[in-house]
Amino acid sequence: MRLIARAPVDGNYDAAAEIKLMGQAITYWREPGEAGVPPIFSFAGSDNIARADVLYPVPNRLDEAGLEAFAYRGRVVFPIHVVASDKTKPARLVMTLNYAICDRICIPAKANIALLLPQSGESPYRAAIEEALARVPVPLAASDVASKVAIDAESGQAKPQWTVKWHGSAAAVDLFAEAPEGWAFDTHKTVDNTFTLTAAEIPAKETHVDVHLTVAGADKSYEFSAPLTMPAGAQAK
């Protein structure tokens, strides 16, 4: 595991945490699915850093002993957007990362690492960082959601269910759903660019929720928030 970075643009840095995994081992996305734990980043102790925001490349949907995991296999690079407190002075990024490495068994891992961010010059890690940034979903503006996505409630289902149709120019290969604590949603592809979204767990007496959806494409992915109202007569079990 290592930290890499390139010289700043307009005083802001692009760094990244790179994890290389052996064999068939995996590590998890921010929403790990039915198994696993998400990575936890901390930048406490950094010098001349106003903020550091971790970006998450789109994961793969993987089978882990019969459970669905949203994870990465082989290698993953998490971009980190860094804003210096004083852009005229050097910045030192200190990172603690707690994560899991899973193959036949899961092992907790922890990395403590620091990097003096480069202030100028060409970085040998530029291509790796740009490749990772290209795998991060693009936030979809609220004004664009209606034209690119159709979400329709399905009646007569045992559990609350919606059909999600993607109308973007690029094909959608997968859909991931994130929800507040107490909620859980399953997603499955039915036909090209069409998915079912099913509420598997609902807190008692709750009828509305904002779900964060990630539409994964082969070349470009998007993420957006979708307000949902539970269809009448349906109930998660």
Regions found by a protein language model. Give the residues of each.
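Extracellular/lumen-exposed scaffold segments
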Residues: 1-237
